[in-house]
């Protein structure tokens, strides 16, 4: 094993890049703007330039670098983005990211994974789930992302769509469409935007109910804060949200039986007001032998992606 490795978490606005030792020590991290012009044609060139510049700065040679891991916001199969457009990367279509980036890096080894799966891999390597062989990570942000690790390996699936937890159907009677085009996806209820949408719906359906959020612009954090303070309508929304999420996690537990669930993203910062009812609802729906599966907050935060990307390289 060589001395260094690079990890990249590619997002629509910036790419987070980390220089690591191959034992997992983060030496330095920085960001590279994501150039989405011309259908994202310059994204990989810019990343290669950034890595070359850092190697020159640190006097690191190619012979000292084990490789580069990269998490991308789209389905990945066999180190290749499958033919689904990544809209937040300027409309990236099918491309062999591994081969293209490797070519720009003078033949350096490059491995690619879905960003949510890679973040889960980071948590199981150096985060909350360190020491676990199997874990499921659910990220509650603008959407709901997911990563499934079984026996230390990312489950990409036959079509690169493994871990699309946010698009589990939890309400077949929903009339509003999810961003994916389906109806009744978990993301519509348990993401930050979903919590706000459902809270607004509750306010409309209960015009006479007192609520500190009525008549205000609010975010998901405000809903959880109101519930913590004893607001009955906000508490009802949190109960419904955690019931839906608990049912989805129980479905996953009943099929993959992980050692641990990890909850990340901005919503996870709600703390006990989220986790306490979530655990109780999960136990209601889970198969008996899975009911005590721990549900914990992820710990690596925004660095999970770069840790997991490096893990792709060093576990090879």
Region locations from a protein language model:
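Short, acidic/small-residue loops that bind anionic groups at enzyme active sites
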Residues: 93-100, 166, 170
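A glycine-rich, Thr/Ser-enriched phosphate-binding loop motif common to dinucleotide/cofactor-binding enzymes
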Residues: 112-121
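ATP-binding/phosphotransfer module of carbohydrate and carboxylate kinases, centering on a glycine-rich
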Residues: 1-67, 76-82, 99-108, 122-132, ...
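Short beta-strand segments
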Residues: 9, 69-73, 113, 137-143, ...
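Structural signature of FAD isoalloxazine-binding scaffolds in flavoprotein oxidoreductases
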Residues: 161-165
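Adenylate-forming
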Residues: 120-125, 146-148, 167-168
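Short hydrophobic alpha-helix segments
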Residues: 30-32, 87, 158
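A charged helix-plus-loop insertion that forms the helical arch/lid used to bind
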Residues: 81-93
């Amino acid at each position: 094993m060589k001395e260094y490795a690079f990890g990249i978490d590619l997002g629509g606005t910036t790419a987070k890049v980390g220089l690591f030792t191959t034992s997992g020590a983060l030496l330095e991290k920085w960001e590279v703007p994501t150039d989405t012009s011309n259908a994202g044609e310059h994204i990989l060139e810019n990343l290669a330039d950034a890595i070359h510049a850092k190697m020159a700065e640190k006097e690191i040679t190619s012979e000292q670098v084990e490789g580069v891991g990269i998490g991308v916001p789209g389905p990945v199969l066999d180190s290749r983005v499958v033919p689904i457009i990544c809209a937040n990367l300027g409309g990236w279509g099918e491309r062999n990211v591994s081969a293209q980036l490797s070519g720009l890096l003078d033949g350096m080894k490059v491995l690619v994974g879905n960003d949510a799966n890679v973040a889960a891999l980071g948590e199981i390597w150096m985060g909350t789930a360190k020491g676990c062989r199997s874990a499921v990570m659910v990220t509650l942000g603008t959407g709901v992302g997911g990563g499934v690790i079984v026996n230390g390996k990312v489950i990409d699936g036959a079509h690169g769509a493994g871990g699309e937890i946010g698009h589990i159907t939890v309400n077949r009677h929903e009339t509003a469409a999810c961003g994916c085009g389906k109806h009744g996806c978990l993301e519509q209820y348990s993401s930050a935007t979903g919590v706000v949408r459902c809270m607004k719906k509750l306010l409309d359906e209960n015009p006479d109910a007192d609520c500190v959020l009525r008549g205000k612009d609010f975010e998901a954090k405000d809903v959880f804060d109101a519930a913590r303070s004893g607001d009955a309508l906000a508490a009802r929304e949190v109960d419904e949200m955690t019931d839906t999420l608990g049912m989805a996690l129980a479905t996953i537990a009943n099929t993959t039986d992980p050692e641990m669930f990890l909850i990340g993203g901005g919503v996870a910062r709600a703390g006990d007001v989220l986790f306490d009812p979530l655990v109780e609802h999960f136990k209601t729906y889970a198969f008996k032998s899975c009911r005590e599966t721990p549900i914990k907050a992820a710990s690596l935060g925004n660095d999970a992606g770069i840790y997991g990307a490096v893990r792709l390289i060093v576990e090879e």
